[in-house]
Amino acid sequence: KVWERCALARKLKELGMDGYRGVSLANWMCLTKWESDYNTDATNYNPSSESTDYGIFQINSRYWCNNGKTPHAVNGCGINCNVLLEDDITKAVQCAKRVVRDPQGVRAWVAWKNHCEGHDVEQYVEGCDL
């Protein structure tokens, strides 16, 4: 499912992401825009680590979910990676919250560092009537 921007912003807010671990809703929206373009079906394979990034948050199979084939996988969220591709993003949000609780925080996401950190991110929630 490709989410419409404001619909996703409302859903993330409803699921408690605005201000979670100090990360504003606008920053989460920027992150999901650049990681997946708001697409829950997005997957990207990383040959160097033989891992795959899944879903709207592009959560990685080396550390956070189990896909049955990533070497030395940890499964920090305790879920099957396919769960991260569901239209219902509740479990993906729970896992993203787990990721951001680590010391790295939101900096775990390369796209956030490259496209959101130090940028004006308000455009990602602009006009959404939140």
Swiss-Prot record:
Q: Which enzyme class?
A: hydrolase
Catalytic residues, per the record, are 35, 53
Q: Which reactions does this protein catalyse?
A: Hydrolysis of (1->4)-beta-linkages between N-acetylmuramic acid and N-acetyl-D-glucosamine residues in a peptidoglycan and between N-acetyl-D-glucosamine residues in chitodextrins
InterPro entries (UniProt xref): Glyco_hydro_22 (IPR001916), Glyco_hydro_22_CS (IPR019799), Glyco_hydro_22_lys (IPR000974), Lysozyme-like_dom_sf (IPR023346)
Q: Which GO terms describe its molecular function?
A: lysozyme activity
Q: List the disulfide bonds.
A: 6-128, 30-116, 65-81, 77-95
Tell me one GO biological process term: defense response to Gram-positive bacterium
Superkingdom is Eukaryota
> Can you give the residue ranges of the C-type lysozyme domain?
1-130
Q: What is this protein's name?
A: Lysozyme C
Q: Which organism is it from?
A: Camelus dromedarius
Gene from which the chain derives: LYZ
